[in-house]
A protein has these predicted regions:
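Core segments of cupin and vicinal oxygen chelate
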Residues: 2, 8-53
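Eukaryotic phosphotyrosine signaling hubs
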Residues: 4-6, 71-76
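Helix N-cap motif at beta-to-alpha junctions
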Residues: 13-14, 81-84
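Short amphipathic alpha-helices within nucleic acid-binding modules
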Residues: 20, 83-89
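Vicinal oxygen chelate
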Residues: 31-34, 46, 78, 87-130
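Exposed loop/turn and edge beta-strand positions of beta-sandwich/beta-sheet ligand-binding modules
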Residues: 41-43, 72, 108
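Generic beta-structure capping elements
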Residues: 50, 58-61, 127
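Arg/Lys-rich, alpha-helical DNA-contact motif
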Residues: 51-56, 68
Length: 130
């Protein structure tokens, strides 16, 4: 038997990333420095959501490298209680939806896509049924 534990993405600004994911309903759990040979290589920031055991791990590397997003990454999907309210909170941070919320099929949930502060594409799915 296997369990899905976490998703890790690299970040460049922990404060902006924390504000973004907290606006989506995630809860900051803890941070942890990764130290090798006396040097701090990275800091991991862990977030949980709902009652799930799965966590989101945001990693800030301290080596000064820049990262290419590449074209293999798709998106992370997150269900939110109220899409309009969530988008309003994100707008306060300067985050806009790529396009207006829409339904994939008639009677289906509304959804839209946004980008987090590092450009990762996030799908937001409305649980409210609006």
């Amino acid at each position: 038997m296997a369990d899905f534990l976490h998703t890790m993405v690299r970040i460049t600004d922990p404060e902006k990333s924390r504000a973004f994911y907290e606006a989506l309903g995630f809860t900051f759990s803890r941070d942890m420095d990764i130290v090798r040979n006396g040097e701090r290589e990275a800091t991991n920031y862990f977030f949980s959501v709902g009652g799930s055991e799965n966590v989101l791990e945001l990693t800030l590397n301290h080596d000064g490298r820049t990262y290419d997003m590449g074209d293999a990454y798709g998106h992370i999907a997150i269900a939110v209680d109220d899409l309009d309210e969530t988008l309003s909170r994100l707008k306060e941070q300067g985050i806009e939806a790529e396009r207006e919320p829409y339904r994939v099929r008639e009677g289906g949930s509304r959804l839209c896509f946004v980008r987090d502060p590092d450009g990762y594409r996030i799908e937001l799915i409305d649980r409210s049924g609006k």
